[in-house]
């Protein structure tokens, strides 16, 4: 399972994450807390992490960027 893009839907209490491989196929679908997103990012090799631009997204983006990921806010 090689995840190249991780889509993150930020919520107040939980976040939904979807991981896509290089062909665009869904290989991971999970609901986690915001801290869980950071822990998941630490386990994954460097990839693109896409999330909506909302309050808290910039902080989470900085944390994920420090882990070596490419963060894209939409």
Language-model region placement:
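Phosphate- and other anionic-substrate recognition elements at nucleic-acid/protein interfaces
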Residues: 1-74
């Amino acid at each position: 399972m090689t995840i190249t893009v991780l889509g993150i839907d930020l919520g107040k209490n939980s976040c939904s994450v979807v991981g896509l491989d290089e062909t665009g196929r869904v290989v991971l679908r999970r609901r986690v807390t915001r801290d869980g997103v950071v822990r998941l990012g630490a386990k994954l090799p460097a990839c693109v992490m896409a999330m909506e631009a909302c309050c808290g997204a910039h902080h989470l983006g900085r944390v994920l960027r420090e882990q070596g990921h490419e963060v894209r806010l939409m």
